[in-house]
Design a protein with these regions (language model features):
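Active-site metal-binding loops of divalent metal-dependent hydrolases
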Residues: 39-42, 98
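Membrane-embedded segments
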Residues: 32-34, 38, 45-50
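Short beta->alpha connector loops
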Residues: 19-20, 41-44, 186
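Divalent metal-coordination and catalytic microenvironments
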Residues: 7, 40, 54, 86
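Catalytic micro-motifs at enzyme active sites that drive phosphoryl/nucleotidyl and oxygen chemistry
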Residues: 24-26, 51, 81-83
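Metal-dependent polysaccharide deacetylase catalytic core of the NodB/CE4 family, i.e.
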Residues: 32-35, 55-186
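N-terminal pre-catalytic segment of deacetylase/amide-hydrolase enzymes
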Residues: 1-34
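Aromatic- and glycine-enriched glycan-recognition loops and surfaces
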Residues: 1-8, 41-44, 76-81
Length: 187
């Protein structure tokens, strides 16, 4: 809250996804102190802690989600009903980080090959991990020597499957696919 309050006091105003789109596609200027707020992973606690601040400062933000979490009904994450309530509040817009979060080609900080890990395992191992890993949509799945362990066709199929699942789940659960897609960092 305090950091956003300082930005507000300095004259920063939030911009929406449409504002950014108009800036790039039409050359429409943004405010001098434009701020685009986005919160990744679609966590329930993020919405709980941020909602009052957005209202107090009259700020807008984008909530990025993984539709895989909708299927799993994981209470840590916002579900479609919650997301609809957020967008109805007028302080939130929807975005996506992709169908799911998974790390591939992972090595620990001692260069031991781990392979593929999900976010839970990543969190449990984080202190032993370095920065040698990649996002599952950004590379071939590789062996410990860096040699692709899948064909180009298999990689394309794996990636296509995830985009199709993203589209199908959002369409079914939310009635639309968010227009904003932010891929998690990759190394």
């Amino acid at each position: 809250h305090d950091q956003l309050k300082v930005l507000k006091d300095q004259g920063y105003v939030t911009v929406t996804q449409k504002d950014i789109e108009a800036y790039y596609e039409e050359g429409k200027p943004l405010p001098k102190r434009a701020l685009f707020l986005m919160f990744e992973d679609g966590r329930r606690d993020t919405a709980i802690f941020v909602q009052n601040t957005l209202e107090e400062l009259n700020y807008k933000a984008s909530m990025m989600t993984y539709p895989e979490k909708f299927e799993k009904q994981d209470p840590t994450f916002l579900l479609p009903k919650n997301l609809k309530e957020l967008t109805d509040s007028s302080y939130w817009e929807m975005g996506t980080n992709g169908y799911r979060l998974e790390f591939i080609n992972v090595f620990d900080r001692y260069n031991n090959f781990i392979g593929e890990i999900d976010p839970l395992r990543y969190a449990m191992m984080q202190s032993a991990l370095g920065r040698r890993y990649n996002h599952y949509l950004m590379d071939f799945i590789r062996d410990k020597y860096g040699v692709p362990a899948e064909s180009t066709r298999h990689m394309e199929s794996r990636i296509s499957y995830d985009y199709e699942r993203l589209r199908d789940i959002y369409t079914d659960q939310m009635g639309y696919v968010p227009g904003l897609y932010v891929l998690m960092h990759s190394n």
